[in-house]
Amino acid sequence: MRLQPGCPGNERFVTWLSSYLHIVNVTTILCQQSITHQTLFTPDLLVSHEGEEMRSVKVYEEAWPLHTPFVIARGSRSEAHVVVVELEEDGVKGVGECTPYLRYGESDASVLAQIMEIVPQLEKGLTREALQQLLPAGAARNAVDCALWDLQARQQQQTLEELLGIELNSTITTAQTVVIGTPEQMATSAAALWNKGATLLKVKLDSHLISERMVAIRAAAPEATIIVDANKSWRAEGLAARCQLLADLGVAMLEQPLPAQDDAALENFIHPLPICADESCHTRSNLKALKGRYEMVNIKLDKTGGLTEALALATEAKAQGFSLMLGCMLCTSRAISAALPLVPQVSFADLDGPTWLAMDVEPHLHFTTGQVHL
């Protein structure tokens, strides 16, 4: 079993056997600054078969404490759990990261198990194209897909953007999130973010105190561009009045007001501001059902199952007349780096996940309030 060097504290070991009879060691290490769950996959054989190129594969999980609780309509988080895939081929390493999401039926264990099932194929040179057929869209495929992209870019001694022929500005505007609290707390947070340089605020709401919170926030940051995320906590009843309130306060967009199963209520619904699909849009297969209901889709690599499908979704969504938003889960800079090629296509980028961490991965992207610096 592997221990994180220099991390004192309690240690708990769990060993389980995969369906391929490979042993996975799960080591939980509690440290003063961070809590790291590390799962290392070690194949039984790492020697190459004659005439066959071989990769080494590592799969492990991490937990990154947040400096402030992340409070949204569905609850509160105090740490970010991620699963990391490392692929190494001829001395070149590619890394991908995902964030398992319970609301999508995912857990750290289920995502690890999904990835473990395809390790033999990864060892033998699995391609991104073949991966799309082996795993469904979701966190597990995302980690592997991004690791394959990263591996290819590094093999060619290019950045991911160079590999794709995409140019990025040296500074990217990202939304900064205002989490749920009292109207006074949210207004104070909005004012602090604005005063530090954030020009785009993403306000989390549930079904309570909507008017009080939004009026206070707008008064605290009168010049900010504001987008609102209800995290599917609203109902169709009263939606028209809430949309009008947001429009009157100059809100630029409303994200996922209703649960995905209630999307039919948005059919031919007249609304004064754009509505963006988050939980209602995972891949290209969802686009047909969104027509006439949403004007924008939020692309997240953990929903699409990686950059491969995310790029295809962006192209198809724009062709069908949708505007785009780029989002993220609570994550490290590894996950944001993988999503950056999509930035030139989107109207809003919400990439502040790593800014909630008490400590980011090394090396990491450089964030200032409201901006990512490349």
Residue ranges and their predicted role:
Residues 41, 49-226, 231-240, 244-248, ...:
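N-terminal capping/lid subdomain adjacent to the active-site entrance of alpha/beta enzymes
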Residues 203, 208-329, 333-343, 358-367:
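Catalytic core of soluble alpha/beta enzymes
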Residues 347-350:
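Short helix/strand-capping turn motifs
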